[in-house]
């Protein structure tokens, strides 16, 4: 598992934001700071400004393609991914609307209002989108506003675009994905299977089903379509090009963001982290993952960063005993993040 998502591949490592996102197929991205570093850690020559510039060029977009969760995905694949996997979230949306006192007619009206407000290449902040809805007489009590923003994106009308300052923005999906790919359903299932096991393998069918939210039957079909593009060894499935590949050289310590595919992409995380440490990584089981320090493929600590004007301060909480030399290696693993944000690094150890 060491360096699983960062290892060299016979086909070469992606060297662009578009390449990394296409390689994974989708990267969880509800927390933008984590999403930026998930890209940056895999693009060592990039700064945060470089990644943001690539997102402004629409090398990737954010929307809710599966599990009702925000992901970075290739723009050209957004429509078919929403049709294939987002449909399950849509199926449950009526029940959600009942709990927040929002009827279907109002939801559809909200989609129309947002579509009109964003027409002509427009881009609006979250607050401006909500103001447009309110101005059209659409109710926004409680969670209704968030649901309408989600619903419009889930239906393939809008997408999340890069922040303006600290504010989330939205635009029409067709403006940011003007040349959509249109595979048929079986082909799409095969694409999802190939991309998942290429980037996450070795993994299992259950892992793919959990990651995508697809049915077991769809996962089975996807694997059949992928055919010899994937290798199977017992319950494990992976890219056959990796089976004779030597372990990743030179990467022993890593500093990964909280919502990273290294932690999120699997049903069983036993090879990555001790069960006794999960509470520290996901406090209270609330789904909010902490950033992790990884040694030899296993999580050995968590970290939190504070961006200042003169330095980035990182507080590290070890989960196992680390010798002084190992702490130095952990600190060295944090240096790429400091370079990414363009600030000197200051490390503080819990209990020190």
Name each model feature, range by range:
Residues 1-141, 275-276, 313:
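Phosphate-backbone binding and catalysis cores of DNA-processing enzymes
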Residues 83-95, 174-195, 199, 252-257, ...:
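Short, amphipathic alpha-helical interaction segments positioned at domain boundaries
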Residues 275, 281-352:
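Glycine-rich, small/acidic residue-mixed loop/short-helix segments
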Residues 113-145, 194-235:
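Internal, well-folded beta-alpha domain core
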Residues 218, 225-278:
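Non-catalytic regulatory appendages
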Residues 142-220:
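Loop-centered beta-sheet repeat module
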């Amino acid at each position: 598992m060491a360096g699983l998502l960062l290892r060299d591949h016979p086909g070469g490592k992606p060297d662009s934001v578009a390449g990394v996102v296409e390689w994974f197929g989708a990267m969880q991205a509800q927390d933008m700071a984590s999403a930026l570093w998930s890209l940056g850690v895999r693009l060592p020559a990039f700064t945060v400004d470089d990644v943001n510039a690539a997102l402004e060029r629409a090398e990737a977009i954010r929307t809710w393609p599966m599990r009702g969760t925000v992901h970075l995905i290739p723009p050209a694949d957004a429509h078919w991914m929403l049709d294939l996997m987002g449909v399950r979230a849509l199926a449950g949306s009526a029940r959600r609307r009942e709990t927040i006192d929002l009827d279907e007619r109002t939801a559809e009206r909200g989609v129309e209002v947002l579509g009109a407000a964003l027409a002509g290449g427009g881009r609006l902040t979250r607050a401006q989108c909500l103001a447009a809805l309110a101005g059209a007489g659409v109710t926004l009590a409680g969670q209704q506003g968030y649901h309408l923003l989600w619903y419009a994106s889930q239906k393939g009308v809008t997408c999340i675009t890069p922040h303006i300052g600290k504010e989330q923005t939205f635009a029409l999906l067709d403006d940011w994905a003007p040349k959509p790919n249109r595979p048929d359903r079986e082909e799409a299932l095969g694409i999802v299977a190939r991309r998942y096991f290429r980037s996450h393998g070795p993994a299992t069918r259950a892992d793919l089903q959990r990651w995508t939210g697809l049915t077991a039957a769809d996962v089975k079909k996807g694997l059949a379509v992928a055919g010899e593009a994937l290798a199977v060894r017992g319950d494990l499935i992976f890219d056959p090009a990796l089976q004779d590949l030597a372990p990743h050289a030179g990467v022993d310590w890593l500093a990964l963001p909280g919502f990273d595919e290294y932690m999120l992409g699997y049903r069983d995380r036993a090879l990555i982290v001790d069960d006794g440490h999960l509470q520290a990584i996901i406090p209270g089981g609330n789904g909010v993952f902490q950033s992790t320090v990884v040694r030899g493929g296993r999580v050995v600590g968590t970290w939190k960063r504070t961006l200042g004007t003169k330095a980035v301060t990182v507080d590290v909480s070890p989960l196992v005993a680390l010798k002084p030399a190992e702490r130095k290696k952990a600190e060295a693993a944090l240096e790429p993040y400091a370079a990414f944000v363009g600030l000197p690094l200051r490390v503080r150890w819990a209990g020190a």
